[in-house]
Amino acid sequence: MDQIDEFLDKVNCTEKYMMEGNHDNWLNYAVEKYPYIPQYKFKTAVKLKERGYKYYPAGKYLKSLGKLSFYHGHLYGGQYHAANHLRKKGCSIMYGHWHDLQQHSITHDSGVKSAWSIGCLKDMSPKANGWLNYRDVNWSHAFAIVDFFKGGLFTVHIIQIIKGKTSLWGELITG
C-alpha cells in the first residue's frame, strides 16, 4: 500500500477507492475464526481510513464513475467471463479478478455497454505461484487508462505489457 500511495501522491490523486477482493477477504475470515485478532481485519490492517481511501467490502459492491462501474470481479467466471459479467450486471463494468484480458460489448437501445477484464501486474511465473501447484496460468500483464467525459461517457484503453515492454502514447516503456 505504501508504494501505491507514493505513486498516487506523485500524480496528485485526490480520490482513492479500495474494492476488497477475495484474497483481501482471507484476512477477514481469519478474524471471524479468531476474534481475538481484530487488528487483522483487512481494512484495519492496511489502514485504509488513515490513508484516505473510500472502502468497498468484497462482494457485490460496485463503484460507478460516470457510466462505468468497477468491482473486484469474482462473482462470474468461465471461459467467457466478460460476457457473463455484462449479461448479469447489465452495465459497463471493469474488473481484475481473473488476471486475464477479455472484453465483450453489446448494443442496447440505450447504447453500447461493455465489460473489461484488465489483466494484472503480478509475477506470473509458475515459481512465483506455487500456491497454484506451479501450473502455467492464462494471465496477462496489462492495465487500463480510462478517459471520462461530460454526461458520464468514457473511453477505455487497455495497455498490454509483453515480456516487460509496452508502448504508450508513442513511447516505448520497458521494465
Where on the chain are the PLM-derived regions?
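Core catalytic region of metal-dependent phosphoesterases/phosphodiesterases
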Residues: M1-R51
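Acidic carboxylate-rich catalytic motifs and surrounding loops in phosphoryl-/glycosyl-chemistry enzymes
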Residues: E15-N22, Y56-K60, H157-I161
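A generic local structural motif
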Residues: I4-D5, Y56-K60, G78-A83
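Short acidic low-complexity segments
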Residues: K49-L65
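Polar, enzyme-active/binding microenvironments
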Residues: H157-I173
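Conserved beta-sheet core of the metallophosphoesterase superfamily
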Residues: L65-I159
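Basic, amphipathic N-terminal segments that precede the first structured/catalytic domain
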Residues: F70, I173-G175
